[in-house]
Amino acid sequence: ESRGLGDVYKRQKHYRVEGITFAIGIYTNLSMDHIGPGEHRSFREYACCKKRLFERSRMICINADDKYHGFMTANLEAPVYTYGIEQPCDVKAEHIVYERSSRGLNVTYQTTGWIKDEIVLKMPGTANVYNSLAAMEAAHLLGISPETIRKTLRNVSVKGRIEEVRISDKFDVVIDYAHNAASLESLIKTLRQYQPKRLVLLFGCGGNRSPLRRYQMLSLIHISE
């Protein structure tokens, strides 16, 4: 997370974004990350640092399914809007279908709430359903039309984020920046949703991080077999 919100969280620890007000703060989830020498001293410090983004946002879009969403929204003055799959929320995904076609791994779903539409993503898995819901809700709050949102989501892709590399029609190759246990587990579960006959996992760990991160990632090998 060298850019974007991940970078903002790091800067907040050193008060480098003091005085900046964000139009919209988006919360996806919170996991044991960025904790160790040179980063955050504890999970609580990390969570509190992350929450400061929403204390300086004019509007907040938050994942209603995440177990820390109550902590993140407590005592906020700005309006809070929700998205999700399981809990009642303002924009909700239903009837999710995971597909493997000649175009690769896709996912389609229906939205209810503010936006009622059929969404097709070429970035696979439940994690990207959540990401697209967050983007959809923020775009809606900024006045972007449902048609533009739908067309954009259908074509969006991010290099290094469940990025498919077309090598053969007999198997799929996916590259992902799964740099901790939470993201690696999410990746494995995403690929399992497409019911592969075999799943081969090749991964490494970034340097200058807590050794605990390596142990946690290694413990996930059994679910990829």
Where are these predicted regions, by residue range?
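Switch II (G3) loop of P-loop NTPases
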Residues: 7-11, 173-179
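Structural alpha-helical scaffold elements that stabilize or flank donor/cofactor-binding regions
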Residues: 1, 18, 53, 220-221
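Single conserved hydrophobic/aromatic residue that forms the stacking wall/gate
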Residues: 1-9, 221-225
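Acidic, Mg2+-coordinating active-site environments of NTP-dependent enzymes
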Residues: 12-172, 196
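Conserved acidic residues
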Residues: 6, 23, 58, 176, ...
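Active-site beta-alpha connecting loops in nucleotide-dependent enzymes
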Residues: 158, 184-185, 189-224
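Short, glycine/acidic-enriched loop or turn micro-motifs at the edges of active sites
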Residues: 32, 66, 178-180, 207
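Active-site flanking residues adjacent to catalytic metal/cofactor-binding acidic residues
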Residues: 62, 175, 203
